[in-house]
């Protein structure tokens, strides 16, 4: 059950960082898929322009695995559209993330909308879409 999945404080912080980067990029109309790698001592944000979702995921896999054991966590973020139960489309930032040493990764989301030319994030009681297998080598 999605409601039973638990996200660590570290992954929650990484999700918030990824969403903040999505908001900045979308507000400047320069949104491209990107990868956040948590590597000591700080982190790295890599833009991942790609022709398809498959190409994006393949490139992210390469970069995550190339980082080896130094990669503590990662987040792959992109702009997409989800649908409410009614079928109504709603724009959302999608973030797949995982932390080394944890059995589960997650695909999470944050809805947004444009109001009077400003991007506003819409709060939702559950941000988790599904469990995901971590992409570590």
Language-model region placement:
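Low-complexity intrinsically disordered segments
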Residues: 73-137
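A charged amphipathic helix-loop-strand protein-protein interaction module that recurs
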Residues: 54-84
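N-terminal domain-onset segments
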Residues: 1-63
């Amino acid at each position: 059950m999605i409601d039973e999945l638990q996200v660590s404080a570290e992954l929650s912080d990484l999700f918030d960082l990824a969403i903040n980067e999505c908001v900045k990029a979308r507000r400047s109309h320069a949104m491209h898929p990107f990868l956040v790698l948590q590597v000591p001592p700080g982190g790295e944000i890599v833009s991942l322009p790609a022709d398809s979702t498959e190409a994006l995921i393949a490139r992210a896999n390469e970069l995550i695995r190339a980082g080896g054991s130094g990669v503590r966590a990662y987040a792959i973020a992109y702009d997409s559209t989800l649908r409410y139960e009614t079928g109504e489309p709603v724009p959302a930032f999608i973030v797949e993330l995982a932390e080394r040493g944890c059995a589960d990764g997650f695909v999470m989301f944050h809805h947004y909308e444009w109001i009077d030319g400003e991007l506003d994030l819409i709060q939702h009681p559950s941000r988790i879409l599904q469990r995901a297998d971590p992409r570590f080598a």
